[in-house]
A protein has these predicted regions:
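C-terminal amphipathic helix plus adjacent low-complexity
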Residues: 343-386
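Conserved nucleotide-sugar donor-interacting segment of glycosyltransferase catalytic cores
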Residues: 55-128, 182
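Active-site-proximal region of nucleotide-activated glycan assembly enzymes
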Residues: 97-185
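Conserved nucleotide-sugar donor-binding subdomain of glycosyltransferases
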Residues: 34-85, 90, 132-166, 170
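A donor-sugar binding/catalytic signature common to diverse glycosyltransferases
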Residues: 76-78, 276-322
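C-terminal "capping" alpha-helix adjacent to the active site of nucleotide-linked donor transferases
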Residues: 324-328, 336-352
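Conserved nucleotide-sugar phosphate-binding/catalytic loop shared by glycosyltransferases and other
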Residues: 3-49, 127
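Donor-nucleotide binding loops and adjacent catalytic segments primarily
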Residues: 179-288
């Protein structure tokens, strides 16, 4: 096994014991500069991100081709955002599998679409019409970007959709959804799609230890993940306000920066701020969670049966908020409304029974992502159909 990734993830991969090939070594922060925006995204920022990705793509493709020429793999597993890998696999006639932690990012044909602010599915004519218009909006936005960048795309021989009307960026062999079917209301995924289950295994559980302070009645963990650099002050401000209103509770913040894990922990009364805490380290030791609705923390809360308040910030988080709300595993609040956050927090504290959360937590363990991946690799290498 060899992992191809950016410079920032080299240490992670080596620690896991895999060989690693670093892409764009001379541009160590190239990928993070695109993904880690300094403010909430909007259509203009999405266009700029796509354009910046397009700028890197020829160089990335060239490097992957060089690696594959030197040592051609039998099969490739690619994250859904690693689009250049698909181009190279097609050129080298290598079968590949797409893994996607946000399955609803795959464009839908008949159901309620994602990435339009967090739409709830409804079953009457007007909402069906809303869904149809929203699906058209998503599709036409993609087409517009591809039209604007048609010159660059033509050089890559890229078309947005295949003959089935499905997106070409995903593998025609196999797509593994790293989530739970029980949390999803969509049923219109491509035929090669399978639910593999969440991947929440700890990578750095031993990096920073958390010792719970028994003098507090309850412990609440707060995080907004890794990528939302612009929102780190916001999560601290929310924690400060809650810690003042609820002095009997301990509030623990993680800023999600593994590279800064050794920095000093800030402890002030009932508010503790860490630069990094692994979810497998902290979640078994707390009672509740306040988070942004990212896939990693959402499924980790299910894994450890932890009720949550979700405050969607950006990207797919509004859609995860919808799914968590419908599944009754969290209360959803608005980032720009302290009143909304406090209301959701109080609701979470007052709710005594979380039956569906307990049920999903048990189902979580039935998923075996690595087993399904192994089966798919065996099937494809034995000549399984695209």
């Amino acid at each position: 096994i060899c992992v191809y990734t950016g410079f920032q993830k080299e240490e992670v991969v080596k620690k896991l014991g895999f060989s690693v090939k670093v892409l764009l070594r001379d541009k160590p922060t190239a990928f993070e500069k695109i993904s880690d925006t300094d403010r909430q995204t909007n259509p203009l920022i999405a266009y700029k991100q796509f354009k910046e990705n397009m700028g890197l793509m020829p160089e990335v493709i060239k490097e992957i081709e060089a690696f594959f020429t030197e040592n051609k793999p039998d099969i490739v597993l690619a994250d859904f955002i690693a689009v250049p890998v698909g181009f190279v696999c097609k050129k080298f006639n290598i079968p590949w599998i797409t893994s996607i932690p946000t399955p609803f990012a795959i464009e839908n044909k008949t159901t309620t679409p994602a990435y339009v602010g967090g739409l709830y599915p409804r079953n009457n004519f007007f909402f069906k019409l809303r869904d149809k218009l929203a699906r058209g909006l998503v599709r036409n936005f993609k087409k517009l970007i591809c039209f604007i960048l048609r010159k660059q795309l033509k050089e890559l021989n890229f078309t947005l959709y295949n003959e089935k009307g499905e997106e070409n960026i995903y593998s025609p062999y196999s797509i593994l959804g790293l989530g739970m079917k029980e949390l999803e209301f969509r049923d219109d995924f491509p035929s090669q799609f399978s639910w593999a289950g969440p991947c929440c295994s700890s990578l750095f559980q031993d990096s920073v230890k958390f010792v719970n302070n028994e003098k507090f009645e309850k412990s609440i963990f707060l995080t907004n993940g890794t990528h939302l650099k612009w929102a780190k002050k916001l999560i601290i401000d929310i924690a400060k306000e809650l810690s003042q209103k609820y002095p009997q509770y301990l509030f623990v913040v993680s800023l999600g920066s593994y590279l800064e894990r050794e920095k000093k922990i800030i402890k002030k009364n009932n508010l503790h701020i860490y630069h990094y805490l692994d979810y497998d380290e902290i979640l078994p030791k707390v009672d509740y969670v306040i988070h942004h609705g990212g896939a990693g923390i959402l499924y980790s809360c299910i894994k450890y049966n932890k009720p949550a308040v979700i405050i969607p910030h950006d990207y797919d988080q509004f859609d995860y908020g919808v799914r968590a709300d419908l599944a009754e595993i969290a209360f959803v609040a608005k980032l720009k409304s302290r009143k909304s956050i406090l209301k959701a927090f109080n609701k979470m504290l007052q709710k005594e029974k979380w039956d569906n959360l307990e049920k999903l937590s048990k189902i979580f363990n039935n998923y075996l992502p690595s087993e399904l991946l192994k089966k798919e690799i065996d099937r494809i290498l034995k000549g399984g159909e695209q």
